[in-house]
Amino acid sequence: MRSVVAVTERVVETPSTVTLRFSYPATADPGQFVMLWLPGDDELPMSLSYSDGPSKGVTIKAIGGTTRRAQSIRSGDRVGIRGPYGNHLDTAPKRILVVAGGSGSAALAPAAERARAAGGSVTVALGATQAPELLFKERFRAMGARVEVATDDGSEGTKGFVTVVAERLLATEPFDAVWTCGPEVMMKKVIVAAEGRSVPVFCSMERHMKCALGMCDACALGPYHVCVDGPVFPAQRLANVHDFGSFHRDSSGRRVPL
Amino acid sequence: MAELAVRCAGVNLRNPFLLASGVWGESGESLAGAWNAGAGGVITKSIGSVPRPGYPNPTIETYEHWGLLNAMGLPNPGIDEYPREIEIARKAGATVIGSVFAGDPEEFARLAVRMATTGVVALELNLSCPHAQGFGTEVGGTPADVEKVVRAVTRAVTIPVIAKITPNTGDPAGLALAAERGGAAAVSAINTLRAIAIDVRLRRPVLSHGLGGLSGPAIKPVGLACVWQIFEKVSIPVIGVGGISNAQDALEYVMAGARALEVGTQVTFDGVGVFGRLAQDLSHLLDELGFARVEDAVGVAHGAHSVPPD
């Protein structure tokens, strides 16, 4: 069930993110993820940040030991891939607002490309700590999306959180769907900003994962398992999930504050 | 509709289908989900004295729909934190059985005492995990060890104690007999079969731990044989587990001697809705075969050998 593939390209996207490209023929829908195996090390759930026929890619943010080592993989190195897993984003809506923070663009960019190819309009509220960390800003522009930027330090665009940009856009323009991925506090604010505007919000969630098959319970999120019930959740499914925005689970299954 | 309620190990179950330990069961919401989907009871993840992260990934390999290989490494939040998860499941009305693992009889007894205070209706002792150093099969691989652990626990708690035994020895029935001598109220059989997967391109085992345990339809005939042999040796109830994916599998286990059943891998393949389907289908199958109650079918295949037993 795993394929072993050679990495064909390594791209430094921002100071903290690296993309690995490879060929993996399985058909994937936008928003799905794969399990990336670093032989002898660990295996990580990674959103497909590129999915164009067999040409696939994952974009890795350095957050711990394994992700750091994954970033140091070079072209020609072999990795294991299984998947794709999980549900996906519906790219049919005509006017889409993407709200991405940190490395959240990785999960949403292929869906935005699909929506653009289908003739939809895409507006991106893109946030990062500082200008060089804005992930896929040029890629979004190249696909014909409008990009509105926020940075924590004000080095580009609005100074402050990207949710401020999202709130302004939602208050002043009509959208048919909102897709968001990033810190859960951010996604919660996006949901609040969309309340009463009759626009559905879809959150791409992340949890510690082991089996990715709905067996081990590592990615339990309220009554759901992110691996099979997600990673995409309509906001109303998260409304009564106490852990959303508050807790995740570590490798032992203990609930720990986000 | 045939009656599915059973009494096993002193516990009343609304139907014989229990969520097997290790599947879902790390969170209370998941246990509640299995109960709400129709499970007759839910068995927790095996809980230890301290939080344990388990092995690095890969922890799993799948084989279409005939099997699943895992070496999770007994990840669990530890007995200090886990009672809150049981509480969530109990608030949903679930019949909860607490699974524990430990490295020696004394630790088993201490842990059992704490688990027994959480409101679980029974304990299941993990004497059979095939891939955790110092635990599971390593403390439950011989009849003497099984008897020691079970006796230590049954002396320490008043709720029923179920011993889950390993198929990875020459004599599972001997282990079951030892559990009975130690005071177990029931035995569950089987845990996973020790197994391994190799990646030929990388020339290495797939699982980070190397060895793991095989579950799913592939192991059903093996589990059935263990239940068959155990039923002929012991007088305590047997809980059948291993590759149950449909009502016929379930009834095969019952006719081999199982009074209750555990379902794990099929939850992975079909989702938790498998519990409602199994209960409904088993009831229909019992009707079709003329059984008024599932309990009437327990062990009926024994004594029907075409060749005299040796």
For each feature predicted by the language model, list its residue ranges.
Chain A
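Short Fe-S-cluster ligation motifs
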Residues: 222-229, 233-258
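Short, charged beta-turn/beta-strand-edge "cap" motif at the junction between a beta-strand
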Residues: 40-42, 83-88, 246
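FNR/FR-type flavoprotein reductase catalytic core
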Residues: 65-210
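Structural signal for conserved beta-strand scaffold positions within catalytic alpha/beta enzyme cores
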Residues: 9, 50, 149-151, 203, ...
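Local cysteine-cluster metal-coordination motifs and their immediate loop/turn environment
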Residues: 107, 184-186, 205-233
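Ferredoxin-reductase
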Residues: 1-77
